Amino acid sequence: MAEKYNPQETEKKWQDKWAADRLYHASEDSPKPKWYSLTMFPYTSGNLHIGHWYAEVPADCFARYKRLRGFNVMRPVGFDSFGLPAENAAIKHNIHPRIWTLNNVENMRRQLKTIGAMFDWDREVITCLPEYYKWTQWFFLKLYEAGLAYRAKAPVNWCPSCQAVLANEQVVDGTCWRCETPTTRRDLEQWFFRITNYADELKDHEGLDWPEKITAMQRNWVGKSYGAEVSFALDCPTAFEKEIKVFTTRPDTIYGVTFMVLAPEHPLVEKITTPENKAAVDAYIKKSRTCTEIERLSTEREKDGVFTGTYVTNRVNGQKVPVWIGDYVLQSYGTGAVMGVPAHDERDFVFAQKYHLPVITVIAPSAYDGKPLEAAYINEGVMLNSGPFNGTPNTEGKEKVCDYLAEHGWGKKTVNYKLRDWLISRQRYWGAPIPMVYCEKCGIVPVPEKDLPVLLPEDVGFRSGGESPLKYNEGFVNTICPVCGGKAKRETDTMDTFMCSSWYFLRYTSPGYDKGPFDPVKLKYWMPVDLYTGGAEHAVMHLFYSRFFTKALRDMGIIDFGEPFKKLFNQGIIVSNHQKMSKSKGNVVTPDNLVAEVGTDAVRAYLMFVGPWDQGGEWNDSGLSGMSRWLNRVWNLFTEEYTPQTASAEAERELKRTLHQTIKKITMDIERLRFNTVVAALMELSNSLAKLKETAAISAENWQNTLQTFALMLAPVAPHIAEELWANLGMKYSIHNQNWPTWDEELAKDEVITLIIQVNGKLRERLEMPAGISEAEAKETALNSERVKPHLLGKTPVTVIYVPGKLVNIVVK
């Protein structure tokens, strides 16, 4: 054996060996229970950073552990490779997005292999390749056939920097999720998916082992509200419509309506605005288009509006109500119209005060004196000024008013959602083309399945301005209508890249299958994913879309399950000097340099040790150096000659106890994904073994068995050095095909425990006692302790509490 450990040489040797042997190839023919381990695949930005490693390494440790526990583990890998950065790079560097992307794939593939993960490279997927996006287009057609894909003109989020449309989920605090530029609104013909059809299912996480923060974010994003849809009579000579509908969660306040507010985008605004108010309304609409939805909804921003000149009639009391427009109302929520009840809504109260609109109290506490309100009353109370409902508790009034409205045909109970349909079309080149054509005779026509994929053309000119480069490629645009054979034009928008990542986990089950998006037999074997790991930032984008996609495919009969991921785990982040790593701060840690310096296993072990996986930790170069030194000590523990002297029964017992306690702890901690304490336990064990080795009181056989067990527990954390040590022990290749060690509960028990003695909860004594001490013996020992007796003088013990093996608490008075 080598005297000095050379991590780079050893790691390359075993990585090459594992690859040549296809050691980590997962087969559906295995008699073992399956385990599908998946980490969110990386975007092809060009280089892996330490955050990628932090996502992959602990997940790989757990996958390796499951393999040793007898599971047939699949851990696939791939690349999310469509998207805006590639197109921006094409414009900036005058390079084709395909070339830029595939160069990045090649580099990142090399980097991923240095992690030493048990990736099954036979299952690699790259979403920008035609053999993948052919099936992305196929899914679009299936969604279209099912009525879940549609085209409509709608106000959309626009990023002026990216020159692209954004889905609602991609706007964060009024800014673009990618570049943080403030977004604006535009009216465009767009393609949408009816994700709202699945609103109730998407807020239900029954049976899933997901973090509560993620399920809460998804429930809040769906935003389910119970209320009523109420129609107000409209008598306007310039409008064909005879009513305006509003959604309200407070039907009990219907008698207090003193104004109505429409969203600036409401289709009736233009029709009902009187000539004398048109200039002011037009100016207000123009101004509102410069505001983001976040700004419009902000509670800090002053609410304003403009009068249209038109009135509606509140049918429950015959009152004429002025119709205003205000940008704090969104067309995308409810009906795009709200009833103003200033007496019982804080926002409406401020609006009414500003524009001198009436305030009518219709809910009041029992002691209400009839004086004008100085602020909106939003608590429960009794209905007044409410016709037949006077004296009714408003909690009952909600239901009664709904029934009353329904009886007269003026309204109905309804449920509303904050969730909007998924906007999936993008005016960019580097994405999967939407497989639709436009024929003057036949209208919108889907591309036949036999003609898929609709390929991206290679010869395109990239330009800014917000229009797809495909629009100017005549060879792509001009085509033949599949129905009538006449001239037609292709859709030039491409799909949101989240479309590609909404099903990639299905493709991993059979990536080479060409008769469909996946082999149904293999899909049934592997799905759903048993453990999915990745960042919490994907809660209302990727994770949300993937769940919708899975449920839609289930309803179409393509798959037979409704949830893609059984268990979800979100890792924390690695910071440097208490700051998130970024190029601008100059604190980015490059894994390539670290591997060259200390080797992969040291980086792996340090990342797992740096802090709880769900919290992350502070990067420290000295900590990494310390981890490297520890692995060298482990190497020396195995490779330096051991010559036993006379075996000691006491030393043998101590060895077995320490070993079995460590097996138990590491097993339980890995199951809980607590990798930092796993590494700490391995360190403690190596220190204990080093001390026992010095005594030379362990038999050669027991020492050999102990080293084998240690290597097995080290294998998920540091797979390369563990494989090398295993081979050096003369064991059968590969360590990663062995069985995880088990512990004996009896052997793991301590012979001696430290018993804490308290009096009224205060520590008074620590005693070393036999591990098997009985409750009676523990209590008697505590009461008779010389250091405890002074605290009992003149006092009467009320009770003595015993926590087995840990403490005795004497309660006195």
Swiss-Prot record:
InterPro entries: aa-tRNA-synth_Ia, Leu-tRNA-ligase, Leu_tRNA-synth_edit, M/V/L/I-tRNA-synth_anticd-bd, Methionyl/Leucyl_tRNA_Synth, Rossmann-like_a/b/a_fold, tRNAsynth_Ia_anticodon-bd, Val/Leu/Ile-tRNA-synth_edit
GO cellular component, one term: cytosol
Major enzyme class: ligase
Pfam families (alphabetical): Anticodon_1, tRNA-synt_1, tRNA-synt_1_2, tRNA-synt_1g
Keyword entries, A-Z: Aminoacyl-tRNA synthetase, ATP-binding, Cytoplasm, Ligase, Nucleotide-binding, Protein biosynthesis
GO molecular function: aminoacyl-tRNA deacylase activity; ATP binding; leucine-tRNA ligase activity
EC identifiers of the protein: 6.1.1.4
GO terms for biological process, alphabetical: leucyl-tRNA aminoacylation
Location within or outside the cell: Cytoplasm
Residues holding ATP: K583
Short sequence motif named 'KMSKS' region, residue ranges: 580-584
Principal location: cytoplasm
Catalytic activity: tRNA(Leu) + L-leucine + ATP = L-leucyl-tRNA(Leu) + AMP + diphosphate
Family annotation (Gene3D superfamilies): 3.10.20.590, HUPs, Isoleucyl-tRNA Synthetase, Domain 1
Short sequence motif 'HIGH' region: positions: 42-52
Signal peptide span: none
Family per similarity comment: Belongs to the class-I aminoacyl-tRNA synthetase family.
Protein name: Leucine--tRNA ligase
Highest classification ranks of the organism: Bacteria, Bacillati, Chloroflexota, Dehalococcoidia, Dehalococcoidales
